[in-house]
Design a protein with these regions (language model features):
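Alpha/beta catalytic barrel-like cores
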Residues: 1-119, 124-129, 187, 231-232, ...
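Short beta-strand/loop segments at the ligand-binding rim of alpha/beta enzyme cores
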Residues: 81-84, 150-155, 215-229
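Hydrophobic, aromatic-enriched interface-forming segments
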Residues: 143-166, 170
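Active-site-adjacent beta->alpha loops and helix N-cap segments on the catalytic face
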Residues: 67-75, 128-151, 198-214, 230-233, ...
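Short, catalytically relevant binding-site loops at active-site mouths
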Residues: 160-164, 191, 197-200, 229-230
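Aromatic/hydrophobic pocket-lining residues that form the small-molecule binding cavity
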Residues: 47, 106, 136, 140, ...
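Structured alpha-helical segments in the cores of large, soluble enzyme domains
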Residues: 106-115, 140-150, 176-183, 209-214, ...
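Catalytic beta/alpha-barrel core
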Residues: 60-65, 121-135, 171, 175-203
Length: 294
């Protein structure tokens, strides 16, 4: 039986969630704006600032244990109306760069995450067409055991990557649908997918591909913003919602362009809050409530 997403949702049943679980990729973003090394404490402070400023306007906030979740809890900056999602993935990749592989983080204790107030667990799968579905299923099963142990909803994110074998063909738009179909067997309570066509071009084409993802995955799903330019994201969310998505769980499109600002909290208030409010209005109007998915 699918676990309820009530604690992650707006009163409308739509999901308007902010991600700030980026780790080395976030360090790389800050490094582009400064000549000095980016310490862990700078990443933690950014996550605390995001939680303090944006959580009153988000239905949930996704945070990692490595740099964020304990500081956010200790400093009591999360709005009571905002659910907390704990990232349970270990991101493998170069310092200051994007993840190239993932694993279940052995240091994430699902019972501790639940006891400090988390209302969901998230895991990232990097999907390549030349890697075996069996290996992905093994990872997902390990993650789902954490969710079963804690009783927390399972949120599975998929990012489709080009194959490691460069001789193999790669059709991103088609493989978004193939990956969603595979994920329909993973017992996720919520699926997190990339926006078709990176949110650019014909809105109707985006909606049509979103409908295909809806039909393939069979569970509530939301879009992420990685790969979508911020000016296109609101329209992309609307197009995907019209295709059956239940909202968004996004980071970069909400806050990436204020990284490096001299006053991060002020920039979040000036730039990110209006953006988030607009996105919330869109999903309230167009998204399919998670509870309507049977």
């Amino acid at each position: 039986m699918r676990r309820a997403l009530t604690n992650l949702a707006r009163p409308s049943g739509a999901l308007a969630m902010v991600a700030v679980d980026q780790r080395e990729a976030l360090r790389g973003m800050f490094a582009a704006h400064q000549s000095t090394p980016v310490p862990d404490s700078q990443l933690t402070q950014f996550k605390v600032d995001v939680a303090r400023e944006l959580s009153p306007f988000a239905s949930a906030l996704l945070v990692d244990q490595e740099f964020g979740i304990d500081a956010i809890i200790d400093q009591k900056v999360l709005a009571p109306t905002c659910g907390l999602i704990a990232a349970a993935d270990l991101l493998v990749g170069p310092a200051g760069g994007a993840a190239t592989d993932t694993a279940v983080d052995p240091d994430v204790d699902p019972l501790r995450m639940r006891d400090i107030g988390s209302v969901g667990l998230k895991f990232l799968v990097l999907w390549r067409n030349d890697e075996s579905p069996e290996s992905r299923l093994k990872l997902v099963d390990e993650f789902n055991q954490l969710c079963a142990k804690s009783g927390l909803p399972s949120i599975i994110e998929v990012i489709v990557k080009p194959p490691t074998d460069s001789s193999r063909s790669f059709d991103r738009e088609e493989e978004l649908v193939i990956a969603a179909k595979e994920a329909s067997t993973w017992s996720a309570d919520l699926y997190k997918a990339e926006v078709p066509f990176h949110g650019e071009g014909d809105a109707l084409a985006i909606t049509r591909n979103a409908q295909r993802i809806t039909e393939a995955v069979g569970t509530p799903w939301v879009v992420l913003s990685n790969g979508v330019k911020a000016p296109f994201f609101a329209d992309a969310v609307k197009a995907c919602a019209q295709g059956g998505a239940s909202g968004f769980l996004a980071g970069r499109a909400v806050w990436a362009d204020i990284v490096g600002a001299p006053d991060i909290p002020a920039a979040l208030r000036e730039v990110s809050i209006p953006r988030l409010e607009k996105l919330a209005e869109i999903v309230d109007q167009y998204a399919r409530p998670w509870s309507d998915v049977r």
